[in-house]
Regions:
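Solvent-exposed, flexible loop/coil residues
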Residues: 23-26, 85
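Short, charged, low-complexity loops and linkers
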Residues: 11-22, 41-45
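Mature, matrix/stroma-exposed regions of nuclear-encoded mitochondrial and chloroplast proteins
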Residues: 2-16, 70-131
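Amphipathic, heptad-repeat alpha-helical segments
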Residues: 25-57
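Alpha-helical recognition domains of nuclear gene-regulatory proteins
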Residues: 39-42, 63, 96
């Protein structure tokens, strides 16, 4: 019984994150799981060949497995996620979910409409000789 209530008790003692504008979440782990699952669902609208989708999907699946594997221990989740406090992880996950929607809207995987000028992506001192 005590093992189950310990994380809740520890969280109840936390009155502030110490970060301006970031409130303590009353039940962060289920919300984090829901956000990660929503992100994975939203990624299905982006082609599998997209590098963005591949990267975000791998990272989100990894984070989701961590959160599901800690069995409600917020402290352990914070340690394994390495993103600071759990509220910060929740904020990062929410931002990524918003970005997935924007990337789908922008169709970032499609080729550029206007082809770049020759040398546009070359930095000074790295230019290749012209043919």
């Amino acid at each position: 019984m005590l093992r189950l209530t310990r994380p809740l008790f520890r969280q109840a003692l936390k009155s502030s994150t110490g970060i301006t504008g970031l409130a303590v979440h009353p039940n962060p782990l289920p919300e984090l799981i829901k956000t990660y699952e929503s992100t994975l669902s939203a990624l299905s609208t982006i082609p599998q060949s997209s590098v963005y989708r591949q990267g975000v999907e791998a990272l989100t699946r990894h984070k989701l497995s961590i959160v599901k594997g800690v069995n409600g221990d917020i402290q352990q989740a914070e340690t394994q996620l390495k993103e600071g406090q759990i509220e910060e992880s929740l904020d990062i996950a929410s931002d990524e979910l918003s970005l997935v929607a924007k990337m789908a809207e922008w169709k970032a995987w499609e080729p550029l409409e206007d082809k770049p000028e020759p040398g546009q992506w070359e930095y000074p001192g790295t230019a290749t000789p012209s043919s």
